[in-house]
């Protein structure tokens, strides 16, 4: 029952929030777009500006100019995930161990609530893909805000404690270390990577023709560096000098990683990069927004599915820990095919969203819009603006 699930989850969250202090304590970020996350985003862009080769295409230069004009939105986006009212209560998706591929809800034995499969690695890809989609429509302000959110999770990947799945429950060092770094962040700020955009991190950012695969590869690379830094210089048994070295390296890596990421993103939106030609996938990511009306939310079950040209059907129940489909809420779901079966996204004939009545009394649901992501691209999107009543299926033809 959803009600039982919610009660169990609330009890677990209340207990864990007491232990964790009610926050994830990653790199610090303030709601007004200041703090460590903001510094990383701003200096990552500053690096790109200063390192930009004169041989870059005019399209890249023009788009970087636009990005600079929306720096404030980039900084606001870079701190927003810590204040998002729709966020997981324990910020579970801000963690990612590159060796297990999981966040702490799966890896840490003390976590007794429902597992969360979102990680900072997945979140980087999701927000960058959504940002690219909006940028290509000319919605630069919204795109930059979404890109900033992606950079937030990229920063989390570079945080030693987050890349090791060591929470404030596991060690008091989590809060102490990140507070230590926050107090010294300005000492760690950089304005160049040491290379221009023809070499170094920028050259590496362009080596994989697939944006989606590169994002995954890049996240794993930097998370491994951060995890190694945790065990070598960042635990409670290490000295203040060790922590200073760790903080300096971690913030440097965050800024350099951000500069490379922004460079790749600018090339993607400038050159119409079509490197992601792989149409096979076993994983989808759907993002749905419930309307901002008084009775728009629902406790009924919601499903998403599609059918291939051969008539094979796939369907998933959309059910995260906590409350799904609340008024004005954006919900995100990672959908994996059974046994890792690969689906050709070019071979999908139609999609559907289905509401199933949970009790004898229907709990209507008003869906505003949705976006479906696969292989680093938004492959389906629609402003639905529809009220679902009773047991109802809404078909979306490709």
Curated annotation (Swiss-Prot):
Region entry Linker, spans: 273-281
Gene: plc
GO MF term list: phosphatidylcholine phospholipase C activity; toxin activity; zinc ion binding
Assigned EC number: 3.1.4.3
GO CC entries: extracellular region
GO biological process: killing of cells of another organism
Name of the top EC class for this enzyme: hydrolase
More details: A hybrid protein between the N-terminus of C.bifermentans and the C-terminus of C.perfringens has an activity intermediate between the two.
Coiled coil (residue ranges): none
UniProt-recorded name of the protein: Phospholipase C
PROSITE patterns reported in the protein's UniProt record: PLAT, PROKAR_ZN_DEPEND_PLPC_1, PROKAR_ZN_DEPEND_PLPC_2
Lineage: Bacteria, Bacillati, Bacillota, Clostridia, Peptostreptococcales
Ligand binding (Ca(2+) 2): 319-320, 322, 324
């Amino acid at each position: 029952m959803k009600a039982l699930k919610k009660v169990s989850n609330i009890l677990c969250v209340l207990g864990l929030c007491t232990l964790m202090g009610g926050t994830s304590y990653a790199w610090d970020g303030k709601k007004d777009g200041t703090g460590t996350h903001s510094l990383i985003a701003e200096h990552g862009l500053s690096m790109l500006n200063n390192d930009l080769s004169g041989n870059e295409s005019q399209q890249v230069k023009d788009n970087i100019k636009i990005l600079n004009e929306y720096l404030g939105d980039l900084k606001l986006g870079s701190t927003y995930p810590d204040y998002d009212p729709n966020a997981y209560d324990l910020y579970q998706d801000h963690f990612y161990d590159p060796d297990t591929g999981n966040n702490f809800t799966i890896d840490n034995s003390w976590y007794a609530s429902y597992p969360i499969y979102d990680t900072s690695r997945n979140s980087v890809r999701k927000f960058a893909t959504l940002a690219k989609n909006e940028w290509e429509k000319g919605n630069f302000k919204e795109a930059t805000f979404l890109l900033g959110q992606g950079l937030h999770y990229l920063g989390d990947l570079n945080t030693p404690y987050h890349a090791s799945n060591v929470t404030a429950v596991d060690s008091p060092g989590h809060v102490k270390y990140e507070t230590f770094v926050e107090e010294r962040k300005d000492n760690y700020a950089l304005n160049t990577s040491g290379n221009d955009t023809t070499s170094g991190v920028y050259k590496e950012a362009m080596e994989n023709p697939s944006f989606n695969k590169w994002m995954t590869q890049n996240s794993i690379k930097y998370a491994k560096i951060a995890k190694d830094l945790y065990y070598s210089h960042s635990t409670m048994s290490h000295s203040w000098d060790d922590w200073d070295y760790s903080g300096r390296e971690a913030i440097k890596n965050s800024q350099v990683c951000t500069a490379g990421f922004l460079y790749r993103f600018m090339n993607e939106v400038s050159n119409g990069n079509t490197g992601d030609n792989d149409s096979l996938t076993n994983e989808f990511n759907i993002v749905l927004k419930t309307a901002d009306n008084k009775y728009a939310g629902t406790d009924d079950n919601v499903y998403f599915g599609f059918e291939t040209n051969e008539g094979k059907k796939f369907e998933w129940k959309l059910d995260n820990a906590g409350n799904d489909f609340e008024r004005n809420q954006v919900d995100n779901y990672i959908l994996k095919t059974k046994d890792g079966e690969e689906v050709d996204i070019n071979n999908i004939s139609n999609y559907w969203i289905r509401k199933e009545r949970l009790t004898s009394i229907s709990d209507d649901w008003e869906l505003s819009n949705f976006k479906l992501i696969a292989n680093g691209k938004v492959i389906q999107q629609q402003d639905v603006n529809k009220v679902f009543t009773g047991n109802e299926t809404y078909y979306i033809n490709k």
